[in-house]
Amino acid sequence: MHFLNLIILILLSSSIIIAQDEDETIILPDIEIQSSIGDRTRLTPGSTNYVGRDLMDKLRGLTVGEIIEGIPGVISEMDDGDTRKANFGIRGAHSRRSRKISVYEDYNPLNFAPYTDPTTHYIPPDERIGGIEVIKGSGQLTHGPQTMHGIINFLNHRPPKKGAGKIITSFGESNIGPRQQYHIRYGRDFGKLGTWQGMFTRHDNRGPVKGDIIDYNDYFLNGDIELTSNQKLAITLNYNHEDSEYAEGGYGLSQYIADPEMGNKRLFDDTFEMDIVRTSFAHSYYANENLKIDTNIYYNFVYRQRWSQTDNEENGLTVRNDINCTSAGSRVDVSGVTNANCGYKNTPRRYHTAGLETRFYKDINWFGKPNNLKYGIKFEFEKIERKARQTGSDKKQTGTQMAEDGTEFAKMSEDAEVYALALYLEDDIQATDKLIMTPGVRYESYYLIHNDRERKDGCGATGVTDCNNYTSYEKDEYILLPGLGFTYEANNTNQIYGGLHMGMAPPAVGDAGYRQISNLKSQKSFNFELGLINKSFEDKLGLTFETAAFRTVERSRPVKSSLRTAGTGSKLKNIGTTFSDGIEFSANWDQSRYSKNSRNWFATLSYSFMYPKLKTHQKGERDSSVDAGSVIVVDDIYENDIPFVSRHKGLLTIGYGMPNKWNISTTARYRGEYFTDIDNSKGIGQSGRWGQVDDYWIINARGNYTLTNFNNSTLYISLTNIFDTVYIASVSAEGLKTGNGRSIMTGIEYNF
């Protein structure tokens, strides 16, 4: 490891020396921060997608998740009314809290602790997103640590060079209650101080069930400063405060059938509170015409806590048993149930993530061939604190469990630190006039220190004094991930691309808890893809399309066992080998590209097919009758579908309008059925924690009208789930969650 680090550092140092030997200063009229500007995906090997702000405004998704759903191979499980929980998956990745992909904002990590607890409970408000990038091919090796399936990067609006602002107000109603969203931003040039922009966003939206209210305020400041003629500094400061009513526990099957919108009946105090502070300093230095150096320093702090009076048990959503409720253990939909005398289960989490990354972009000639090198190094530090306690109704600790060392956290107290180092190298080799070969390699290493101070169950209740149940362990891992991509420009209208690479994902605490992840292996994958982009018919027919075929072979994928005894709802285990074969297709048609009519039709089609298979021989585990019944061993799971991966996903949008004036469109969105356990159980269990999720269709529509006499401000209206389709949005260890019902939103974007 030390030898490899030394070699890389020598390579980096040599580049700096070369730069110093050449011209010291180069005048560049416009310097861009590589991680913050525009559609970079066209410069990345392999399959990529980019959704710009214009398309986002045209589609008017109810949430960011609906925009993400339109990208081939990408899914979004929208179970909270505002996509705050960011359940994104790419090419067969389990979407739960986006733990198996890397999620960024201006290439600063949004996964709370990327190496150990990569959960996401936050994405930027859709109003301040300038674009969305998705990278699925070998180009993701320059990011990480999750490199098996793909990455999603949200790009913020950059500060305007001339004074400009925007006010966005959105009001609407869902079948649960009102929805309100406000956004204001303004930016201008402050001379030598640079261009700066401030944004404020507020969301107050009802979720898909009664008792769910997503409520947050977001404060954002970014600036671009021209330090010299060849240096630029981009600064980002962000504070987000959320105070939502959200029940983590989901339904049982009978509750979903009886009333899919009941939630916690608004009888119980289930809340989610979160404070996020994010800051980054990104410096770009053009050493000369052939060398650019980007350095990014970032720090994220997250403090979130959940207060819950309900939980999912064998028979569905119930009043918690461990908080002294009068109706403890009763289903929330039982007549006369109450939260009298209820305390709370409180689960605070604290995350610190800090990093330093330097990237070099070097243009050179080797053996007479142009080469575009991209190489870099990243250091990252994470500190995580996870606690749980039981409290009284005043939210102060009560109960019989003994406190540890006089502190208040009696049920669970654990912390972890991670020290990570990543090195990467990618080279675009112009092999011929039409062929670019892109070999690359990534080296990942991390060191984990974990301390667990959990108390034994029932400690103090029966006079037991030996309550210590401490564990502590250390873990390190090193892995080398090679890759190779290619791009072949057959002509100006056809491009063939492909590649292969190895990927990895460290075991996450969400897979099994810190105490168990020491027994889980990192996932590793072999990824293959071949794709075609065709624009032959763009000028004459306004038609472009792209298709890609891929295979992902995973080793040691953690999947949910069907062992349904009490208390094992969230346990996962390494399953062995899995194969995910798939085809993605997307097409865009725009009549205005060839027609002289003032009004024209347009359409978008995307479709993804997956064939996800378990390729390991292993006996499944079922119970004899109900969820907590006697466990019996069943048939071999070989060739069963991988849990949580649907075979079919599609979207079709058809619209009509006058460019830059008005448009109307409708969208049909389809998600195929999928299983949630390795046994591929055909029905949903009574607890709602496992089983087969049925397919569904959702129909949306929207319209936009531009006010040309008012700085091109826009009026819009959006209808989501027009036919009020009832469907299951997600299934997890906490039960099942229903999706958003019918919603209507209208508003104005006023430019000034």
Residue ranges: model-predicted function:
Residues 284-288, 292-310, 489, 495-499, ...:
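Membrane-embedded beta-barrel scaffold of Gram-negative outer-membrane proteins
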Residues 229-238, 274-313, 317, 321-455, ...:
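Face-selective signature of the C-terminal outer-membrane beta-barrel domain
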Residues 243-245, 249-254, 383, 447-449, ...:
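Surface-exposed extracellular loop regions of Gram-negative outer-membrane beta-barrel proteins
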Residues 65-108:
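Extracytoplasmic beta-strand/coil segments of soluble accessory domains associated
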Residues 187, 238, 427, 498, ...:
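Conserved C-terminal beta-signal and adjacent last beta-strands/turns
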Residues 108-136:
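Short acidic/polar hinge/loop motifs at secondary-structure boundaries
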Residues 361, 432-433, 437, 540-553, ...:
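Gram-negative outer-membrane beta-barrel transporters
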Residues 164, 173-204, 208-247, 271-287, ...:
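Transmembrane beta-barrel wall of Gram-negative outer-membrane proteins
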